[in-house]
Amino acid sequence: MNNYQLTINEVIEIINRNTDINKLVAKKDNLYPTDLYDLDKQQLIAIILNSDFALSSIKRALLEVTVEELGEQDNDDDLDEIDSELYEDAEASDVPHETIVKVFEADKSIVTFNGEKLKHYVNVDVDNSSVDEVKKIAKEISEHDFNDEDIEEAELKTFKNHLPTIYSMKKENK
């Protein structure tokens, strides 16, 4: 990857294009954006370094420029490495390969995440007591009939129980 170094004129151009930085610089020492060309290099750097906002804006502008330039260099080896480290998920967004959960076909009970084996993985295809317990709980939950009226009634009771507290807090604040 190339090393990018800004000239003072490029920094001034970035500042001139960013109205928020212009306002910030104008407030500092009663300067106006056109006066930036008259500033000595050290003064300009001091103004920029003393402003977190100016620094973040310049970093953002530099990142945009760098990304644009990298995007134009398709034959760049670094880009090929980056592309090989990404895969496209179901939503068509790039995801690093390290975050893929891997299930080995030979033994589905072994699962890795970022290359580390996960110990607590339940294989629902295997018949044993812990899996049966999990299946039983899942079945009970799926068969349970959640009555909306009962839920609303419970919420209303909870609210009514808290009303005196809310009322007394309001009285105290007046």
Curated annotation (Swiss-Prot):
GO BP terms in the entry: DNA replication; viral DNA genome replication
Superkingdom of origin organism: Viruses
Family, similarity comment: Belongs to the phi29likevirus protein p56 family.
InterPro entries: Phage_Gp17
Keyword Cytoplasm included in the entry's annotation: no
Protein name stated in the entry: DNA replication protein 17
Pfam families associated with the record: Phage_Gp17
Keywords for the protein's UniProt record, in alphabetical order: DNA replication, Early protein, Viral DNA replication
Gene this chain is encoded by: 17
Keyword Kinase: no
Function: Involved in the replication of viral DNA. It is required at the very beginning of the virus amplification, conditions in which a low number of viral DNA molecules enter the host cell, possibly to recruit the limiting amount of initiation factors at the replication origins. Once the infection process is established and the other replication proteins reach optimal concentration, it becomes dispensable. Optimizes the binding of protein p6 at the viral DNA ends, thus favoring the initiation of replication.
